[in-house]
């Protein structure tokens, strides 16, 4: 599918954007004005996407339950019936690795952060709630195995994977909001690479326009499970547009004015 190819291209551009931000941090030996939450949410979101995609590919239990629920769409005797894109798996893995490198810089250059930087309480609460829900659904889904192919409270192992997929999309769709807020609180975008903002916006534009313009004959059950939903890309596009306006127009030339934060 051409749309999947464009998603892969957008992912490749996202990797370039993150590497540009990494280089910017290294050149300035500073992470002043850069959101911790942006790269944390992106890392966790892509990690969950990988977890779900690999289970859809290789978990016989997931494939069996999916086949029992939708036998016409995903027959058990057809190993290729569950649509998963290996290209997108590779993309998510590479993005996760790049985010990890920037997170390492955020720790290494932590002495240069200002008072509003750091992992926010909001992100900690959201990720903690998702972690508890993930552990709870996992425990419910395996409680009756291997005697029964079902879990407590009607939570099958397939539900556990599906819930994590929803959580991953929620984390990914709002990942740029913390950076937008940091820029607003500091009235500056000094810590954000203009190349990162521009290339990221270009990546989301290509992906979004590809879905809107290019016709597709794929039926709903043929769309790869690890393909990012349209509504996630739309929210990312809007928030990136705001950040790009902050970088290019609203806070252009503004100098940093906030004091350094605590280590």
Swiss-Prot record:
Source taxon at top rank: Eukaryota
The question of whether Oxidoreductase is a record keyword is answered with: no
Chain ranges passing through the membrane: 1-21, 38-58, 82-102, 118-138, 151-171, 196-216, 230-250
- Keyword presence, Ion transport: no
Q: Keywords of this protein's UniProt record, alphabetized?
A: Membrane, Transmembrane, Transmembrane helix
Its Gene Ontology cellular component terms are: cytosol; membrane; nucleus
Membrane topology, as annotated, equals: Multi-pass membrane protein
Q: What is its main location?
A: membrane
Subcellular location, in the record's words? Membrane
What's the name of the protein?
A: Putative uncharacterized protein YCL002C
From which lineage does this chain's organism come? Eukaryota, Fungi, Dikarya, Ascomycota, Saccharomycotina
């Amino acid at each position: 599918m051409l749309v999947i190819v464009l998603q892969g291209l957008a992912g490749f551009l996202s990797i370039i954007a993150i590497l540009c931000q990494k280089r910017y941090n290294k050149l300035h030996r500073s992470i002043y004005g850069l959101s911790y939450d942006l790269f944390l949410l992106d890392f966790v979101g892509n990690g969950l996407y990988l977890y779900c995609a690999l289970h859809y590919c290789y978990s016989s239990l997931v494939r069996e339950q999916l086949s029992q629920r939708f036998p016409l769409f995903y027959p058990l005797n057809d190993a290729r019936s569950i649509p998963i894109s290996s290209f997108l798996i590779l993309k998510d893995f590479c993005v996760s690795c790049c985010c990890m490198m920037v997170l390492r810089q955020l720790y290494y250059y932590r002495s240069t952060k200002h008072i509003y930087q750091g992992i926010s309480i909001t992100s900690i609460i959201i990720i903690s709630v998702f972690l508890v829900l993930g552990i709870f659904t996992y425990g419910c889904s395996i409680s009756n195995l291997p005697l029964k192919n079902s879990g407590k409270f009607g939570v099958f192992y397939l539900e556990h994977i599906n819930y994590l997929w929803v959580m991953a999309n929620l984390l990914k769709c709002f990942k740029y909001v913390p950076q937008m807020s940091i820029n607003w609180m500091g009235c500056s975008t000094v810590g954000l690479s203009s190349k990162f903002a521009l290339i990221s916006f270009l990546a989301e534009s290509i992906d979004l326009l590809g879905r809107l313009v290019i016709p597709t004959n794929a039926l709903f059950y043929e769309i790869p499970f690890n393909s990012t939903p349209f509504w996630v890309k739309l929210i990312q596009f809007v928030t990136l547009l705001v950040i790009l306006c902050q970088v290019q127009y609203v806070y252009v030339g503004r100098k940093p004015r906030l004091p350094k934060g605590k280590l």
